[in-house]
Amino acid sequence: MSPETGLPPETGLPPETGLPPETARRVDALVAQAQAVGRAPSLILGVLRAQSATAGAGAGRDVPAGGLVHVAAAGETPAPDPEMQYRIGSITKTMTAVLLLRQRDDGLLDLDDPLERHLPGTPLGTLRLRELLGHAAGLQREPDGEWWERSAGADLATLLAALTGAKRAFPAHRTFHYSNLAYGLLGAVLERCTGESWWKLVRSRLLDPLQMTRTSYQPAEPYARGYVVHPWHGTLREEPRTDTGAMAPAGQLWASLADLARWAGFLADPDPEIIAPGTLAEMCVPVAMADLDSWTAGYGLGLELHRAGDRVYTGHGGSMPGYVATLSVHRPSGIGVVGFANAYGLRSGSLPMLGRQVLSTVLDAEPVPVRPWRPATAVPTGEIAELTGRWWWMGREFEVAWEPTAEELVISQLPPGPVPASRFGRDATGRWQGRSGWNDGEILSVRRDRAGAVTALDIATFVFTRDPDRLD
């Protein structure tokens, strides 16, 4: 580590992008402790900031979102660095999910489509794509046969031929039930919809645009060999590096730490050329809760969700024989953590738990970047000017303001209360539709008198007027 920046020299990051020295020391200590106690041959973990957290207004997207600001590494088998590949395991699922949501946005499928629509004749045809994405379908965890992660993968025809109605462990939506098999089937849906192989889609639609040149289907040197650590005498057994075939969409890929940071940055701040930011936000809405006792863990559309106090972290863990991986981002701040170890699990704790601990450590020490307020360059005209100002509903005062950058009406209660402001923007037909807050998705209708003057705002039968004594 560089004494000036706390960064390994190979990252080449300028000092101003690194963590404060005390925070960097705490992160380094957590990683060193995890490697020693967990008995990992090597362990590497990086802290990143998405581009939105560091770039000024008007900055282009020539550099993919997400950049490492600190790297902590421990172990010597091999000595890790940010360009060395490890296997990312189930973090692969996040890429499969993004591809599927993009096909939905492009009109090639609907998330409520039954599987039968895309894989005709399957005995699991009533399961819906949304249920498979969110592990709410009740589908069994693994395909039949030998453990797919450690054996030669079957082709798609073999995977589909082995399906039976008995593959369901629970009725849909009964409970969260993690299913690798579900993502093998979703990969098949992608291939049927697009006519392209899953790997070609990943490479052309995701990796190439994000300049993730160190992410691959098979390992490319330099890469860390993966091991199982003997529980009694600490020796290493090298694990096979399998081609998982039709199950590849569930966990095949390899990546460097620097590349995984780019992907994490994308999940925090998506490039709209790849997927709409609103669609990525949709992926972060829980489909099923994995932890019904304390509601600290859930699953969205291809993304794990973890609550840590008042914060929610988005991402995914990954494991394949010989490897564990983690990706976790705090989307509001654009700060995230990615990491690898080349052992099949840590003796104490887990790599995803370590990642979230490090993320909390950084966020506790780092203030969330504040975007500067900038004055508007023009006074709103037309209907926008008519709608801004004070309004009343049921004796409560509200203010409607215009945000020109977002092109949104913002409705806030006065004085500010616990209910967040509602934002409205024009939909494709020109109507005002809610984009956030209590009225997300609702339509704001403007009432006018015979002369055309605005008299009221109607939001789902809640009528706002200029006079507190009027109710309609």
Q: Where do the PLM segments sit?
A:
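Catalytic loop of the DD-peptidase/beta-lactamase superfamily, centered on the K-T-G motif
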Residues: 2-66, 83, 191, 196, ...
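Active-site-proximal loop and beta-strand segments within enzyme catalytic domains
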Residues: 4, 17, 21, 36-43, ...
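Secretory-pathway/luminal and periplasmic proteins that interact with or process carbohydrate-rich
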Residues: 54-56, 62, 122-128, 138-144, ...
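Short, small-residue-rich loop/turn micro-motifs
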Residues: 73-76, 136, 307, 331
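An acidic site on a long C-lobe helix of protein kinase domains
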Residues: 125, 182, 256-259
